């Protein structure tokens, strides 16, 4: 928890990302956990969008605690290297259409029940089953029988993926519907975590008080305030906790979290408010770390948005024009003060196969003249009127306000006043709920922190 990421900024229809990891040096006010003699780490977080269920989380507010609560078949180190965690071995056939997975003996959930092969197969099937409406369902799409579990109206919710076969308590096989050489790495993602029998008896209650098998165990969740985890002394894996616990403190303003970092009442923060990007690395009250990372931030323009339809000439022209109208270099330099870099790919420089010169990457370069030409061509097809506006939705509690203000200003300066406007939501939870419920009109902020180290996961 001591490394800070300098996040790549993607604008393939994209906005900006920023954020590092900071740790507080503490202060003389006696409020820090270290001053109280406790070996508990306090970490910055947002309120999770959903209950704490591994297969129903696709954002960091829930992802960070879930990662510590659940051990998967494999785990990753800080450099993205994989090693077996619960798995004894994962072997594929020659064409990577079948995997045989063996488990280590002795693993238990924090309720004392054993982790078995069925703990994985039932959990994966539950997440894949459309009746259960889990956000991580698509991660199981390459497993045989996935398509049969997608008509939620005809399902009960307990149907199993036919490609999963339990051999015994410590072995199961996975038959895929196509070759998938990345599957052995993919299973390190949180959605592939095992679940105890108590989950299936009452998923709703479980989501409020999860039972895992990871390096930490759940203690409490005070909504919109904090999530408290304590060290799991029975954990048998390769991520043994070096402290007594982690308390995730929920913030709606980065500035408030940064002030707590400075005072010593917050230990770790992975973002920097815009007001501090010039000074944080010289601030004696914090320990700052600023290196290239694997996170990208972007915005999404819906495929059927008026004037931006993805399958039309007008839509293609306008998407290119908007992208070229955004001065990424200027935003990174003047708004983010060098704490981010413009993205030149849909992945990050740390991802195997990354390229900064792929076909079409010219659309990610600021080109005022070309942007105006493309916009004019689009207008010749279907005029942009005073009633039209491209809005950008984002959560205002994560430091995105200044970034999207700069994005909108850049677009309007090139394509004309009033073409674009901001559409902020108060909190990340409000924002993600609106996105998930498809209530956002216009473009919306998105981003990706890789679930496993592969270009496939970004794409």
Predicted regions and their residues:
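Ligand/substrate-recognition segments at binding pockets and active sites
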Residues: 376-450
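Structural transition elements
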Residues: 341-378, 397-402
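Ligand-site clamp/hinge motif
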Residues: 199-207, 234-279, 294
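Gly/Pro-rich hinge or "lid" segments in bacterial periplasmic/extracellular proteins
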Residues: 170, 176-241, 245
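Surface-exposed binding/hinge segments that line
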Residues: 102, 119-122, 126-128, 132-196
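Alpha-helical secondary-structure segments
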Residues: 116-123, 169-175, 214-215, 243-245, ...
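C-terminal motif of bacterial Sec signal peptides marking the signal peptidase cleavage site
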Residues: 21-24
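N-terminal lobe/hinge region of extracytoplasmic solute-binding protein
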Residues: 44-94, 211
